[in-house]
UniProtKB/Swiss-Prot annotation:
Tissue: Ubiquitous.
Descriptive protein name: Squamosa promoter-binding-like protein 1
Residues covered by region (Disordered): 55-98
Keywords assigned: DNA-binding, Metal-binding, Nucleus, Transcription, Transcription regulation, Zinc, Zinc-finger
Free-text comment about domains: The SBP-type zinc finger is required for the binding to DNA.
Composition skew (Polar residues), residue ranges: 72-87
Binding positions (Zn(2+) 1): C107, C112, C129, H132
Gene3D superfamilies: Ankyrin repeat-containing domain, Transcription factor, SBP-box domain
SUPFAM superfamilies registered for this protein in UniProt: Ankyrin repeat, SBT domain
Natural source organism: Oryza sativa subsp. japonica (Rice)
Renumbered zinc finger spans (SBP-type): 104-181
């Protein structure tokens, strides 16, 4: 075998490429990529070329995939068998800086300075001194280990029984051989053990492929030989003469042709499921399953949200660079999944290329993927028309299954097992919503998330913002028993959207949790859901645990759905060409989001949803946007919830000046929600509020609308039976409601004279009130008060005292002397008559003869 690689290839730089997470397109960020992104093809003759380029981790040297797996397995000098420790970091076995001279091998235990140059070959090969091979506990990279005498390697301390020098797995194998346990009928323990060993060996092969870029020159030299040993062990475990042919040609073609056939021809690693032909196109139709009947809420506006789930699929493509992606990669993924994803986005990062695809699929589709991941990976390869999926090594993780293929042939399909102890679990993150253009301090709590083999990733907007080892982020102040806590800070751009926090181990298995980036008022409301998502506070003894888990699932589904909503809105707002613009958000899912926000009284979220709706971001199922909104009956829902803040927001919300209903001209702003809107049987929100006994605040909000429609409708709006909201309140005995609204009417509308007409022939009483307007003009408004359930058709009986009084008043009105003007005229006439009588009558004057006449008088003396 040649001396290894002549020249190390360098991994592509993430900063040299711009990745479109929606279109699945990679474009160089500069005119010419930097040297570190170019593939160097210098290889030695006769070398095994697995199509793997060497990698150089740019973010953190400790996270180098090339250092993760080079020493993950070793060859036993006695029998040639290979035993592997999954998930071990090769940094544990690399020489510690400053502990010994770099000219010779040294012990890998922390603080050990023993030079192994003069030690036995056994100690050199395993990089351990004689003392530490017999030690009960040693520390490697500050983690407790113990050297296994049978595996000839270090294992984590928890893999040993107390006082034992061999790990539990080796002891179990030894005990089975020693005791010769009789195998029950139908159970083949040896075959199960061989399958387990085969899986481990293939996984070690995967790790070795990831670790060809080890920094040590000796490791580069032994890399191809080490792969050959892995292939030999794989063939030995397969146990067939056909697979022994791989010993002759230890290259990728031989591995693909033989090992791929071993898996594909029914020798499944996990079950005896018959193989499904890959070449035939299978339609992803929903299987006939028993529908859930219990716990079905008839009032739920959107049931589909419970039947879809957002999850991810991870691919690791060896020997590939971003420019190897075809232009129709997104179309290939959608065709592979039979166009079932309703939403999809992707992220890439070096190593060689790790492609993470988040998608929203129906639950039945996720179940089909989990039931037979090997079939679906083979289908992806068979449908491909380019070399991306057909050449080189490809690792894929579909939910809890790992697959490995080479040159289009499937080699491995295995359920994922944790590297250390139990599986990882994210219990809670905070905050779940971050304001745009801000820096957030995240806290991640979980189980088994801080391990030597795990790292934390924070992704947003198609980019990886954080890639750090979890041990560096571990909060030392919270190292008590129980969940582990990771803390880190991250800055976000001014764009809104949805991101993920991932905890990943070196097997590429990872957990993720969503978070939202939006306006501050929107984030402050969404953060109120954190207590529902906190699994740390859940106690197994709680009676209502199932209800809490259901509420958590609903809140988590809202985060995913609102995240997809923000993603589509951002894409539509920033797309330069129509082809890049995705279709609008589905109306049914929008109704579910709106219903959830109204149920939680998220006023800022409702405003965000409505603004996007009027900007054309939703595919409506009706012609008019206003009609779509009014059909949701938001005011009625707010009144039934007795939510005064929500009513205040709805009554003051106006449409923006953005084009509505797809028209080119901007529609004028208008108030969408009014308190006098009529519902079934012409009942208004005022009628409903008047019937409740604890809705004084709600009624106060309904009568405080900007257009003053509430106080006008209080006595005028009638339902199908002719009753007003005031009648509803009076019948329920809510006099305080009547007094409150009447005070508003008196204070906001000027007082006027009231004329009352009483008639013996009328059956009703009419009140007419005249109000002066701001322009000093009077408008007459009639308030008809109907008492009783129905208006009686019989005339009411006349009052016995009213008839004589009316007749008396009528008689007095005809007597003119009672009027002051007539009396004055009579007095003047009487004076005139008296003067006339005096003038015409002959007065008797003493001393004069004859009658005295006025006309006989002379004027002046003679």
């Amino acid at each position: 075998m040649s001396s290894g690689l002549k020249k190390k290839g360098l991994e592509w730089d993430l900063n040299d490429w711009r990745w479109d997470s929606n279109l699945f397109l990679a474009t160089p960020s500069n005119a010419s990529p930097s040297k570190c992104s170019r593939r160097e093809l210098g290889r030695a003759e006769g070398e095994i070329d697995f199509g793997v380029v060497d990698k150089r981790r740019r973010v953190s040297p400790e996270d180098d995939d090339g250092e993760e797996c080079i020493n993950a397995a070793t060859t036993n000098g006695d029998d040639g068998q290979i035993s592997g420790q999954r998930g071990r970091s090769s940094e544990d076995e690399m020489p510690r800086q400053g502990t010994c001279s770099s000219s010779g091998p040294c012990c890998q235990v922390d603080g050990c300075t023993v030079n192994l140059s003069s030690a036995r070959d056994y100690n050199k090969r395993h990089k351990v001194c004689e003392v530490h091979t017999k030690s009960g506990v040693v520390r490697i990279k500050n983690v407790e280990h113990r050297f296994c005498q049978q595996c000839s390697r270090f294992h984590f301390l928890q893999e040993f029984d107390e006082g034992k020098k061999s790990c539990r797995s080796r002891l179990a194998q030894h005990n089975r051989r020693r005791r010769k346990v009789q195998v029950q009928a139908g159970v083949d323990v040896n075959s199960l053990h061989e399958n387990h060993s085969l899986s481990n060996t293939l996984l070690l092969l995967l790790k070795q492929l990831s670790g060809l870029d080890s920094s040590g020159p000796s490791e580069q030299i032994n890399g191809p030989n080490y792969l050959t040993n892995l292939v030999k062990n794989l063939a030995a475990l397969a146990g067939t003469q056909r697979n022994q042919d791989m010993l002759k040609n230890a290259n990728s073609a031989a591995i693909a042709s033989h090992t791929g056939n071993y898996v594909a021809k029914g020798n499944s690693l996990h079950d005896s499921r018959p193989h499904i032909p890959v070449g035939t196109e299978s339609t992803a139709e929903e299987p006939t399953v028993e529908r859930r009947v219990q716990n079905f809420d008839l009032n739920d506006a959107y049931v589909e949200g419970d039947e879809n789930r957002t999850d991810k699929i991870v691919f690791k493509l060896f020997g590939k660079e971003p420019n190897d992606f075809p232009s129709d990669l997104r179309a290939q993924i959608l065709s592979w999944l039979s166009n079932c994803p309703s939403d999809i986005e992707s992220y890439i990062r070096p190593g060689c290329i790790i492609l993470t695809i988040y998608m929203r699929l129906p639950n039945w589709m996720w179940d089909k993927l989990a039931a037979d991941p090997a079939h679906w990976i083979q289908k992806l390869i068979s449908l491909s028309t380019d070399t991306l999926w057909r050449t080189g090594w490809m690792y894929a993780r579909v939910q809890d299954y790992l697959t490995l293929s080479c040159n289009g042939n499937l080699m491995l399909a295995s359920p994922w097992q944790p590297a250390i102890g139990n599986k990882h679990q994210i219990l809670f993150i905070t905050p779940i919503a971050v304001a745009c253009s801000s820096t957030a301090n995240f806290s991640v709590k979980g189980l088994n998330i801080a391990q030597p083999t795990t790292k934390l990733l924070c992704i947003f907007g198609g980019k990886y913002l954080i890639q750090e080892a979890t041990e560096k982020l571990l909060d030392d102040t919270k190292m008590q028993r129980g969940p582990q806590c990771l803390t880190f800070s991250c800055s976000f751009p001014s764009t809104s959207g949805r991101g993920f926090i991932e905890v990943e181990d070196l097997d590429q298995s990872s957990l993720s949790f969503p978070f939202v980036v939006a306006e501050e008022d929107v984030c402050s409301e969404i953060r109120t859901l954190e207590h529902l998502l906190n699994l740390v506070s859940f106690d197994d003894t709680l009676v209502e645990k199932n209800d809490l888990l259901a509420s958590r699932d609903r809140a988590l589904n809202f985060l995913h759905e609102f995240g997809w909503f923000l993603q589509r809105s951002h894409i539509r707002a920033t797309s330069e060409t129509p082809k890049d613009c995705t279709e609008g958000f589905p109306a049914a899912r929008f109704r579910w989001l709106l219903s959830f926000a109204v149920d939680r009284e998220f006023c800022a979220v409702i405003k965000k949803l409505l603004d996007t709706l009027f900007q054309g971001g939703v595919d409506l199922d009706v012609q008019s946007t206003v009609e779509f909104v009014l059909k949701q009956d938001l005011v009625f829902v707010a009144v039934n919830k007795r939510s005064k803040p929500l009513i205040d927001f709805l009554l003051t919300y106006t449409t923006s000046s953005a084009p509505m209903d797809g028209t080119e001209s901007a529609a004028p702003a208008q108030f969408l929600f009014t308190p006098d809107i009529a519902g079934p049987s012409d009942i208004t929100p005022l009628h409903i509020a008047a019937t409740y006994s604890d809705t004084a605040g709600v009624l106060d909000a309904l009568t405080d609308d900007p257009q003053q429609l509430g106080i006008k409708a209080w006595k005028n709006a009638r339902d199908a039976t002719g009753l007003t909201p005031e009648d509803y309140a009076r019948k329920r005995g809510h006099e305080s409601y009547i007094e409150m609204v009447q005070n508003k009417i008196d204070s906001r509308l000027p007082k006027a004279h009231v004329s009352v007409t009483i008639s013996s022939t009328t059956s009703t009483t009419d009140f007419t009130e005249k109000h002066a307007s701001q322009s000093k003009t009077t408008d007459q408004t009639a308030f008809d008060v109907e008492k009783g359930q129905q208006i009686s058709t019989k005339p009411p009986l006349s009052c016995r005292q009213c008839l004589p009084e009316l007749a008396y008043r009528h008689h007095l009105n005809r007597f003119l002397s009672t009027r002051p003007a007539v009396l004055s005229l009579v007095a003047i006439a009487a004076v005139c008559v008296c003067v006339g009588l005096i003038m015409q009558g002959p007065p008797h004057i003493g001393g004069m003869r004859g009658p005295f006449r006025w006309n006989s008088l002379r004027s002046g003396p003679k």
